């Protein structure tokens, strides 16, 4: 899917993705199968209040949270399985592993520009409520995290995305 998005971005134009539509559908199917077996984690957990309160589509809400969650993972545990992800991304995106996640965030922004949460109607006073809600209601997902995230961590992530 990354190589297809890279190609579509390089070709430009709003219809460039259509050349890879079947690949995107296949990748989405595989992702669904993988999620069913491995589960999801903080990105999805933190997306739920955004969709529930502000009706942000779940996929877009995931995109809004992804980079900041990953940065928090890197901050809390820079050495570990995250390095395997960096190696895989580096090979696909043609960049050194140390820059791989940033290259992914840039590609994601090229596909769909990430807007701050405030531009989706989220207010700053909602952020602590969302963080608390995620801790209280999404332990099934949070249990799959790369590292444990506290309510304070979640609030920090929401604030970064705000």
Q: For the regions a protein language model found, what residue spans apply to each?
A:
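Glycine-rich phosphate/pyrophosphate-binding beta-alpha loops
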Residues: 30-59, 139-141
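Short alpha-helical scaffolding segments that buttress acidic/His motifs in well-ordered protein cores
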Residues: 24-32, 46, 66, 104, ...
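Residue-level detector of well-ordered alpha-helical segments, enriched
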Residues: 20-23, 42, 61-65, 81, ...
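Short acidic (Asp/Glu) and glycine-rich catalytic loops that position anionic groups and cofactors
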Residues: 1-2, 43-47, 82-86, 108-113, ...
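Carboxylate- and glycine-rich phosphate/diphosphate-binding segment that chelates Mg2+/Mn2+
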Residues: 1-38, 146
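Short, amphipathic C-terminal "tail helix"
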Residues: 126-162
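Short glycine/serine- and small hydrophobic-enriched flexible loop segments
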Residues: 2-7, 29-30, 52, 67-74
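Gly/Pro-rich interdomain helix-loop hinge
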Residues: 53-126
């Amino acid at each position: 899917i990354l190589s297809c998005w890279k190609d579509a971005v390089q070709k430009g134009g709003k219809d460039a993705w259509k050349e890879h539509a079947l690949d995107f559908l296949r990748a989405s199917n595989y992702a669904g199968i993988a999620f069913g077996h491995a589960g999801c984690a903080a990105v999805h957990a933190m997306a739920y209040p955004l969709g529930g309160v502000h009706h942000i589509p779940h996929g877009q809400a995931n995109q809004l949270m992804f980079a900041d969650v990953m940065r928090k993972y890197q901050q809390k545990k820079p050495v570990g399985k995250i390095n395997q992800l960096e190696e895989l991304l580096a090979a696909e995106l043609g960049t050194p592993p140390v820059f791989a996640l940033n290259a992914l965030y840039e590609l994601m922004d090229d596909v769909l520009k990430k807007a701050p949460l405030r531009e989706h109607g989220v207010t700053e006073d909602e952020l602590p409520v969302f963080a608390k809600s995620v801790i209280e209601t999404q332990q099934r997902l949070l249990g799959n995290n790369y590292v444990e995230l506290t309510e304070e961590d979640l609030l920090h992530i929401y604030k970064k995305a705000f």
